[in-house]
Amino acid sequence: MALNTLLQTKECDNFQLVRIIPMIRYVENQDKTAWYALDHDLPETSFDEKVRNRQGYVCVEDGRVIGILRYNLFWDSIPFCNMLHIDKEYQGKGYGKQLMDRWEQDMKSSGYGMVMTSTQVNEDAQHFYRKLGYKDSGGFVVDIPGYEQPLELILMKAI
């Protein structure tokens, strides 16, 4: 087992259940190549800023970055998750939830009372966020030539 993976055990009817917990940490400069394998939208000039401001997280399993989360502040005051991406091979196994939980805990510890995110309505992510307690709070359509996209759904959650 890699050093960057934790084990959580629980006694249960004369045997132990063991669950592997991936390491979730702030993104570091050394993660740049792995980061861009999952995030094709962040301008490279912004990566150093995410590292410096601790506005990015990586989920590491067996020494490999399998998920990322990055955020900024909406209206300079509300944490807004801009990107959550889990490698396809690891999707549907709870890693996204663990990344969101860590981010929400950190935001609450920093004194924030709510968080936000968004997703296009044609993506399954909206259902994921609702399961985590996020509420639909509006949306917008981008119909400017060259930037068109389906309705972007804004979601919010009190923490």
Spans of model-derived segments:
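A short beta-loop-alpha structural element at the N-terminal edge
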Residues: 7-35
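Acetyl-CoA-dependent GNAT
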Residues: 26-83, 87-88, 100-101, 106, ...
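Conserved acetyl-CoA-binding loop-helix of GNAT-fold acetyltransferases
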Residues: 92-105, 131
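Short glycine/proline-centered loop/turn elements that form peptide/ligand docking sites
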Residues: 96, 100, 122-125, 142-148
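Conserved GNAT acetyl-CoA-binding A-motif
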Residues: 107-119
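Conserved catalytic-core motifs of GNAT/GCN5-like acyltransferases
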Residues: 116-118, 135-152
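Short beta-strand-to-coil "C-cap" segments at the C-terminal boundary of structured domains/repeats
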Residues: 156-159
